């Protein structure tokens, strides 16, 4: 069983992008495939997964940054954003995510 730990920022934004039903499908998929996302370079193991929304393909969908702690049965959902609004994650945000994940894994 996987427990999802949602950051305050993720919780604030998720319903701007996904319906409850879409979010449920996303969680089921991620629980079954926790290593599916690409590891973001310089993030300390944070992964980015592309997820399509209803009526859009992956390129018009959202990106979710997450950290999988499979040995602890946890997936940390950190950030969700539209592909159209952000080309890449700024370095200072990646650094903050890396520091947070280092703290979590200790």
Predicted regions mapped to residue ranges:
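Arg/Lys-rich, positively charged N-terminal/basic patches that mediate binding to nucleic acids
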Residues: 1-21
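Amphipathic alpha-helical transducer elements in NTP-driven molecular machines
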Residues: 20-23, 59, 94
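A short, surface-exposed loop/turn module that caps and links secondary-structure elements
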Residues: 28-58
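Short polar/acidic secondary-structure junctions
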Residues: 54-56, 67-70
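Short, surface-exposed coil-to-beta transition loops
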Residues: 60-64
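Enriched for short, Lys/Arg-rich terminal
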Residues: 68-106
